Amino acid sequence: MSTFYTVISWLAIFGYWLLIASVTLRILMKRRAVPSAMAWLLIIYILPLVGIIAYLSFGELHLGKRRAERARTMWPSTARWLADLRSCRSIFATHNSEVAAPLFQLCERRQGIAGVKGNQLQLLTSTDDTLNALIRDIELAHTSIEMMFYIWQPGGLADRVAEAMMAAARRGIRCRLMLDSAGSVAFFRSPYPAMMREAGIEVVEALQVNLLRVFLRRMDLRQHRKVVLIDNFIAYTGSMNLVDPRYFKQDAGVGQWIDVMARMEGPVATTMGIYYAFDWEMETGKRILPPEPICNILPFEKESGHTIQVIASGPGFPEELIHQSLLTAVYSARQQLVMTTPYFVPSDDLLHAICTAAQRGVDVSIIVPKKNDSMMVGWASRAFFTEMLAAGVKIYQFEGGLLHTKSVLVDGQLSLVGTVNLDMRSLWLNFEITLVIDDDGFGSDLACVQEDYIARSSLLDPLEWLKRPLWQRVVERLFYFFSPLL
């Protein structure tokens, strides 16, 4: 009997180390950043079973077999649609400013579609203004309303949006709504899904959280886009979720969330529509490509207006494009670079680009919230401050609430606005969308918004920063080590 238990013990030990060795080899064979690989290996060696389960659940980009198969079958029809759209030469920009040209060229070559011109663009900086404008557009819709958000939180003006959308569906407008399962959990537990479906709205719960399928698809892969499309002509996107900040996360201790949204009219709505259709088919299997363009009757064939490129990122989209785009924008800066983000955990390449910009004489400012709703990200962000301050980067800590705006402004001309945070999750994992605008008028509007943020912020003093307590430095470095996983 003792021999039997001895054999079992040795087999268990052998299996234990074989499992660790197998996962280690799997991590090493994957083409991933060295800091990320090292962080995962450390977790596995310190807490083997917990680390292995965590890695198999969250360490690799599993889209899921069903969605991956749909992504493969969707591309031919999408490619044909893009080819048809490219035949409408009058809507595409052929020239860009010097600072914007490299980024527009990158996006066109990687996505297969150029930036579109002739768009009317409005920057909305107030939640009330955004939601009231959205309600008006819904009430005036003629044919279709399509929405996608990470979070829809019932309460306040968000309820008025829901009521307007249900009224539109009842009068015959085709309405679709896609919300992330994890982000909009409060919505899906409310009466609204049933009420909306009864009114005729197609409601889809994207990337459903199912613990039984945890090893088949990453549960932390989220649909983070915020998109509204109306009549294939009006479009919204930006950092704002479908929430009224007076009712949202009031107990988080960070104040009201501060966001911006862009409202657009023109051909950019058509290009955004193809990405909405991609996400819808990925989730439901139903093909809803926008109407094929008929060039001679497009209502927005005109030379005036803003030139906009749309970047869609996430599984199934051009790999690393948003990361490449940010690097291209930073390296294009010659005079000034201003970036706002709620979560700052950059890649080594992006951090190096930002510091290099400051060291070559560019006026570089980063605006982040002083109080963050994510303790881990807040501490990890601080770990990058010393290097940036030493390089000459100005770091502003916003004190007027949780600054949730994601924006980049280069030389007052090139603007990036959308859903992408400057952290690993947005850069490498989640479904995101970003607008690239080549226009000094819009750049001036964005600069005014950023200057208002700076006026409500405190500038971090490099000398005072070096005097912070030792325990804070230790905590920062601890979270910095795990920053590739945040």
UniProtKB/Swiss-Prot annotation:
Protein name stated in the entry: Cardiolipin synthase A
Domain PLD phosphodiesterase: 219-246, 399-426
Membrane topology according to the record: Multi-pass membrane protein
UniProt keyword terms in alphabetical order: Cell inner membrane, Cell membrane, Lipid biosynthesis, Lipid metabolism, Membrane, Phospholipid biosynthesis, Phospholipid metabolism, Repeat, Transferase, Transmembrane, Transmembrane helix
Gene designation per UniProt: clsA
Coiled-coil regions listed in the entry: none
Reactions catalysed: 2 a 1,2-diacyl-sn-glycero-3-phospho-(1'-sn-glycerol) = a cardiolipin + glycerol
Function according to Swiss-Prot or TrEMBL: Catalyzes the reversible phosphatidyl group transfer from one phosphatidylglycerol molecule to another to form cardiolipin (CL) (diphosphatidylglycerol) and glycerol.
Biological processes annotated in GO: cardiolipin biosynthetic process
PANTHER family: CARDIOLIPIN SYNTHASE, PHOSPHOLIPASE D
